Structure formats: structure tokens, C-alpha cells
Swiss-Prot record:
Role noted for this protein: With S4 and S12 plays an important role in translational accuracy. Located at the back of the 30S subunit body where it stabilizes the conformation of the head with respect to the body.
Any one GO molecular function term: rRNA binding
A Pfam family matched in the record: Ribosomal_S5
Notes on the domains: The N-terminal domain interacts with the head of the 30S subunit; the C-terminal domain interacts with the body and contacts protein S4. The interaction surface between S4 and S5 is involved in control of translational fidelity.
Protein name: Small ribosomal subunit protein uS5
Top-level taxonomy: Bacteria, Pseudomonadati, Pseudomonadota, Alphaproteobacteria, Caulobacterales
């Protein structure tokens, strides 16, 4: 293969190898699939070591539904397929404000991984890195400021992000839970109530 053809096959730009930390995105019908992480694992068996691959996938419809999955197989494509199937089965719905951002701040923790997410005004974009960005983008979030601390393990970061998303509640959901009107909840938020106050107060 000629050098020019090889460069075109890599996207027309000589960028070298793809950043292994950047999620690989695929679109399947209405579902966006992102490969967050893949690694080779070894198991000691009689006669030596057996190698396989473990994949971490995130899928979502970019309309408020998202899921994650883990798959292991002796070949990379099969590991990705298993992880994708599991992710689709575990999809959850998260309420979004104006279909673009979170309703309130969110905090999550899993293992040694901690994440913090804040709603942001239009035009902010998704300010988040690695695994967190993959989850938020497949969910459909367009404006958010997110930060992770502690463990950089992608599995911990993804789980911590989902823990933070679990506490997201729309004004309608909070009003129904408390037996109040939506206007009362919105008025309280306008007065500067924090996310924990809005949910637990």
C-alpha cells in the first residue's frame, strides 16, 4: 500500500496512533456506543497463562438514557460485543434540564473514585475528561462542568458517574415526592437552594 493511501486510511492526516484514552464511538441505529477502555487480562491455568481481553462500553440514546457494560473474551471484538449487550440491558433514564444539562449538582463515589458534576449554561459544552465525558455525551448532556478526584481507574470513574446521575431529579419528580406544586420547587431553586436541599430538605 502506498504511503498516501495509508494516510488516507487513517483519516487523511498523519496523526500516528489513536489516543488509547479517548473513547471510540460507534453509532448503531438510535444508540451511540462508546468504547471507554479495553485491557488484556491473564489467568493462570494448568499448563501456563491464558490471556483474554476485557472491554468497558457505554451506550446511550443521547436523549436521557444511558448504560454501561463490561465484557470479557479471548478476542477484542467479542469482548466489545458482550460489553455492548450488557450496557444496553442496563440502560437507565436520567432527567435532563432543557434536554441539554443536569437539573442540579451531582456527586458520586465508587471505590476510590469520586466525581462532581454541575449544571452549566448554554454554550458551555461538556467539560469533563475520559470516562465521565463518554457517559455524559451518550446520555445527551450538552453543557456540564465535571471533575473527578481519587482513582483514575475507568471502571471506578464510570460507576461513580452513574452514582451521581442516580440522584438527578426533575422539579416535577421532587414536587410529586413532597406533595407540592412544581412552581414551589422552582421558586426555591431560584432562591439559591443547593441540590441536596432541593432533594432532601
Amino acid at each position: 500500500m502506498a504511503r498516501g493511501d495509508q494516510q488516507r486510511g487513517e483519516g487523511g492526516q498523519n496523526r500516528g496512533r489513536r489516543d488509547r484514552n479517548a473513547p471510540e464511538e460507534r453509532v448503531d441505529s438510535d444508540i451511540v456506543e462508546k468504547l471507554v477502555h479495553i485491557n488484556r487480562v491473564a489467568a493462570t491455568v494448568k499448563g501456563g497463562r491464558r490471556f483474554s481481553f476485557a472491554a468497558l462500553m457505554v451506550v446511550g440514546d443521547q436523549k436521557g438514557r444511558v448504560g454501561y457494560g463490561h465484557g470479557k473474551a479471548r478476542e477484542v471484538p467479542e469482548a466489545i460485543r458482550k460489553a455492548t449487550e450488557e450496557a444496553k440491558k442496563t440502560m437507565v433514564r436520567v432527567p435532563l434540564r432543557e434536554s441539554r444539562t443536569l437539573h442540579h449538582d451531582g456527586y458520586g463515589r465508587w471505590g476510590a473514585g469520586k466525581v462532581m458534576m454541575r449544571a452549566a449554561p448554554p454554550g458551555t459544552g461538556v467539560i469533563a475528561g475520559g470516562p465521565m465525558r463518554a457517559v455524559l455525551e451518550t446520555l445527551g448532556v450538552q453543557d456540564v462542568v465535571a471533575k473527578s478526584t481519587g482513582s483514575s481507574n475507568p471502571y471506578n470513574m464510570v460507576r461513580a458517574t452513574f452514582e451521581a446521575l442516580k440522584v438527578q431529579s426533575s422539579p416535577r419528580q421532587i414536587a410529586a415526592k413532597r406533595g407540592k406544586k412544581v412552581g414551589d420547587i422552582l421558586g426555591r431553586r431560584a432562591d439559591g437552594a443547593s441540590a441536596p436541599d432541593a432533594i432532601e430538605g
